[in-house]
């Protein structure tokens, strides 16, 4: 498999770890059509520190919404089945019942957005989250450095999906970007 970077310049994908990303030359044409009203920007910036982004009566609702979008993640090198099971219980019940009751949200069925684990821990998360709608996310593709071949990355993604992951957090090869 070959990927063409520029005319007459190809890099075999199986050796992509050794490839160097030459980047692109800076081109200002993308900014030529942008007009900025400097005084309006300065006026807006001056008001930012004195304003709250969310009014007090809506803060709890926004915080609960944020909880529903969080991926609870455990990516410790010594993760165990027990760690994953505890994390999944927290994902199913992220806020104490008494606090939800004070907010009138006791029937909201609040959960986090997902639980993220290493590929080898997917079965434990799947077991703990059975019967819920909480998706499992897996870090695949050689986390954290991404220093495995493209073929191995694709294989690991396929295995993670087959094991039950609904979301895949991928790691790009940093040396291709930097």
Residue ranges: model-predicted function:
Residues 116-117:
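Short beta-strand scaffold positions
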Residues 57-67, 78-110, 120-178:
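Alpha/beta enzyme core
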Residues 2-104, 108, 113:
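Alpha/beta catalytic barrel-like cores
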């Amino acid at each position: 498999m070959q990927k063409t970077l520029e005319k007459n310049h190809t890099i075999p994908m199986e050796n992509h770890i050794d490839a160097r990303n030459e980047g692109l030359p800076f081109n200002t044409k993308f900014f030529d059509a942008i007009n900025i009203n400097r005084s309006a920007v300065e006026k807006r910036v001056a008001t930012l520190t004195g304003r709250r982004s969310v009014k007090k009566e809506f803060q709890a609702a926004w915080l609960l919404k944020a909880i529903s979008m969080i991926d609870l993640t455990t990516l410790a090198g010594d993760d165990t089945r027990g760690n994953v099971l505890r994390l999944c219980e927290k994902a199913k019940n992220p806020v104490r019942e008494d606090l939800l009751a004070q907010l009138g949200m006791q029937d909201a069925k609040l959960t986090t957005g997902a639980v993220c684990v290493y590929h080898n821990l997917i079965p434990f998360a799947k077991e703990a989250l059975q019967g819920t709608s909480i998706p499992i996310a897996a870090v695949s593709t050689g986390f954290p450095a991404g220093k495995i071949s493209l073929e191995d990355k694709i294989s690991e993604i396929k295995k993670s999906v087959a094991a039950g992951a609904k979301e895949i957090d991928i790691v790009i090869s940093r040396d291709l970007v930097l």
